[in-house]
Structure formats: structure tokens, C-alpha cells
């Protein structure tokens, strides 16, 4: 569905959408969450993520930021949390569409048609998160294209990449990306230039 489709959702803040979910974060979300908690991105990634990629959950598989009062980081919650119960899909050509997810079992939230998807995005402060997610996706797409071109020219590299992919599929968390740790990345870059951050 498009942004113009009639849609509304009244969240009851029951917290059911905060359980049994794997929330992947991008650098913008890491920065927002780290600042909300008064941490550097380095400390945030170490304390609150799994391999610097997904938000950590408690042993009961509930988001570590869910408290009895609700989401402890609500003003800076990730895009996927802002969109719920919508999912957003963007094609490689940049075409955007939304899908409505099935409600979590027992969720008392109410669906309706009082507004539009666009209204829902605005009410949840999604626009800066959407822009940053698109920029992150574009960077990933560019890196992927360059990597594919490199592999096409080097059969040994292609075989190695295949082995690495198989290794990553062995039910292990993915390796942490230094790009997600913007504080460390910026600090190392400034140090290399002989500048103080």
C-alpha cells in the first residue's frame, strides 16, 4: 500500500510488539539511542546490542528497553518500532510500499481508516528515520555492487566470499560493523588526521 492509503492504528501501549522481535539498527538509530542513554556509541553497542547489529533482549525475549512504564527510549525508538504495525519495503529502484503486519496475539490495538499511512508516519516522527534508513540502504547497495564487480573479476575472491557466506549462515550472530560505531569511527579518523574530536 502507498502513503495515501487510508490507515490508522491506535496503540494501547500493551508492549506485546516488544517481545519476540529482532530489531536491527542502523548508525542513525545507534546514535539516537546512545545519546538518549548518555552513552557513547561504543558503549551502547557493547551493552545493548547483539554483535552491534540487533538490539539485545532480556532472557524472556522482551526488548531490554521495555519497562513497566513502557518504552524507556520511546522518543528515540528505532524506525521499525515507529512503523509498527506497518512494514516498509523499498525496491532497488527506490519504490516504496507498506504492508500491514498481523497484530501480535492478544494486542488490544485498534486499526482504522481515520487517516492515511502518511499521517501515521508523521504522527510517529518517522521521516528522519526513513531518510537515514534510505541513505544506509543506498550505501549498502553501492558497496554490494562494488563487491559483486570485484568478485566477477577474481574467481579466488568469489570462492572465498562463498566460504564466508556459508560460515555466516552457521547460526552465529553476524560480525559487528565498525560503521555502526560512529563515535569510534570518527575518533579514529580524526586521530589519523592528527585532529582532536
Language-model regions: role of each:
Residues 1-197:
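Short loop/turn segments that flank or connect secondary-structure elements
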